[in-house]
Amino acid sequence: MKNILDFTLEELKEWMKENGENAFRAKQIFDWIYKKEVFNFEEMKNISKALIGKLSENFYIGIPEVIDYLSSSEDGTRKILLGLGDGNIIECVIMKYKYGNSICVSTQIGCRMGCKFCASTLEGMVRNLTAGEILSEVLIGQKLLGERISNIVLMGSGEPLDNYDNVMKFLEIVNADYGLNIGQRHITLSTCGLVPKIREMADKEMQVTLAISLHAVSDEKRKTIMPIANKYSISEILDACNYYIEKTGRRITFEYSLVSGVNDTKEDAKSLGRLLKGMLCHVNLIPVNEIKENEFKKSTKKDIETFLNTLKTYGVEATVRREMGSDINAACGQLRRSYIKSKGLKL
């Protein structure tokens, strides 16, 4: 049996025709799933019993089990722990803003990028999520919240461009009129810098915001915290980013996790300012999430403020990310790890 959430409208239309059904039935079924949040074929009232029988024999609607659902008492952030059909566990985070609801989704179970400050990569890669599994995070998030999700950030567990085909299919369905109809300009994809895939994505001329996890201003320093730096230099990443800007007209976001004594000095800020000066970009400064498995500590408020103000002297737009959901382990990978460990399960 196949997860119907892995299908585009054209693919489901083709299946309908191959199985003696009218192609327009595909749109009706997706209306039930994406517009009416009905996740059971039997409840689709304008679908014949015969077709429901065929659907039930060939497909399932892959909505995961909700294992845990936490709400922050500080800012209303929600953390959802989900169980997949194969026993694996993923997580997503819903953040409430004045402009609407945003969800941070995972794209892989674990991650093989090995970034030193990230909890989701500690035990390596388990497997990629399918397009439908990524979609299910948004669907279950909306269902639990009881409100529309208007923004998506691909910043949860996993490297999205390491799961390129499934992520591109997810973006197609989530953006489509028949899907969740979320505009590409309301979607941000974060990558540690897989240069060929950045260029491939640029050639699609999508309007998705590209966010680069930079975190250091020299290749030498970046190699100590991000193994991907051994493969792609900062210069190569910036060239790919400029190509993305040229093809899409979209501003790039650079994410920079501030780690005390590692990359947070005034000289680091000056180097970053010189590196990005004149580029169509924005820098998102992130106080690092402290985890037990490493000794990284957050920069002081004073050092963060100095870093921010120094960047601005170079004409580089920058802000400090507001920490959300800290009381519920909202950073990517943290809740999954703590849950699995508490149950004595294997990561």
UniProtKB/Swiss-Prot annotation:
GO terms for cellular component: cytoplasm. [4Fe-4S] cluster binds at C111, C115, C118. It catalyses: adenosine(2503) in 23S rRNA + 2 reduced [2Fe-2S]-[ferredoxin] + 2 S-adenosyl-L-methionine = 2-methyladenosine(2503) in 23S rRNA + 5'-deoxyadenosine + L-methionine + 2 oxidized [2Fe-2S]-[ferredoxin] + S-adenosyl-L-homocysteine; adenosine(37) in tRNA + 2 reduced [2Fe-2S]-[ferredoxin] + 2 S-adenosyl-L-methionine = 2-methyladenosine(37) in tRNA + 5'-deoxyadenosine + L-methionine + 2 oxidized [2Fe-2S]-[ferredoxin] + S-adenosyl-L-homocysteine. Its EC number is 2.1.1.192. Binds 1 [4Fe-4S] cluster. The cluster is coordinated with 3 cysteines and an exchangeable S-adenosyl-L-methionine. Residues 97-327 form the Radical SAM core domain. PANTHER family: 23S RRNA METHYLTRANSFERASE (PTHR30544), RADICAL SAM CORE DOMAIN-CONTAINING PROTEIN (PTHR30544:SF5). This is Probable dual-specificity RNA methyltransferase RlmN. It comes from Clostridium perfringens (strain SM101 / Type A). The lineage of its organism: Bacteria, Bacillati, Bacillota, Clostridia, Eubacteriales. The gene is rlmN.
